[in-house]
From Swiss-Prot:
TM ranges: 35-55, 76-96, 102-122, 132-152, 156-176, 188-208
Subcellular location: Cell membrane
This protein's name: Uncharacterized membrane protein YhhN
Classification of source organism: Bacteria, Pseudomonadati, Pseudomonadota, Gammaproteobacteria, Enterobacterales
Single GO molecular function: hydrolase activity
One Pfam family recorded for the sequence: YhhN
InterPro entries named in the record: TMEM86B-like
Organism: Escherichia coli (strain K12)
Length: 208
């Protein structure tokens, strides 16, 4: 797994670097390549079982979403749909491993964070208002169920999945905030780092 981890980190770094100073082709190549490497890493997991295919499917949906974000603006709606599907598949994966439990502070915190994000970007969303609201809601549910899984069963795989899901939410928070409200110098780096790290930690949970 060490060499696979190094390959994923190198590819992710080259993808982020392309957003600031690299040629356009570098971003087109290394962003999908990073997810393809994660797909290969997930496929080789020693604890791979039937429900693990949901992780593979989630990565494939994210790969499609990434490809669509590289296209012109009119494809953004489809990209949001692909990311929604990815988070839905991850949510089903988390839910399939737990029984009904409820740790009320977690959904409360997530609701506050979701409301804060919507307050920041609401007036700029225009025709994407409801699709993005739905996507944010799905992301919050994903993090909530990953957290509930860890609180219900505090194991290393559950913690890795919870941290991974949380990083995906942070990535979306930064991406949407910078895209619809105000850009800042490190926005692409933070969003991409959290995005790749989030997917990696969810894949890592298959190894623990």
């Amino acid at each position: 797994m060490l060499w696979s981890f190094i390959a994923v980190c190198l590819s992710a770094w080259l993808s982020v670097d392309a957003s600031y100073r690299g040629p356009t082709w570098q971003r087109w190549v290394f962003k999908p390549l990073t997810l393809l490497l994660l797909l290969l890493l997930a496929w080789q997991a020693p604890m791979f079982d039937a429900i693990s295919y949901l992780v593979l499917a989630g990565l494939c949906a994210s790969l499609l979403g990434d490809a669509l974000t590289l296209l012109p603006r009119q494809r953004l709606m489809y990209a949001i749909g692909a990311f929604f599907l990815s988070h839905l598949l991850y949510t089903i994966y988390f839910a399939s491993q737990m029984t009904l439990s409820f740790f009320w502070p977690l959904p409360l915190v997530l609701l506050v964070l979701g409301a804060l994000l919507l307050a920041i970007i609401w007036t700029r969303l225009e025709e994407y208002r409801w699709p993005i609201c739905t996507f944010i809601g799905m992301t919050l549910v994903m993090v909530w169920l990953a957290g509930e899984l860890w609180f219900f069963r505090p194991t290393a795989p559950a913690l890795s999945a919870f941290v991974g899901a949380s990083l995906l939410f942070i990535s979306n928070f930064v991406w949407l905030g910078s895209h619809y409200r105000r850009r800042f110098r490190a926005d692409n780096a933070i969003a991409a780092a959290c995005y790749f790290a989030g997917h990696f930690l969810i894949v890592r949970s298959l190894y623990l």
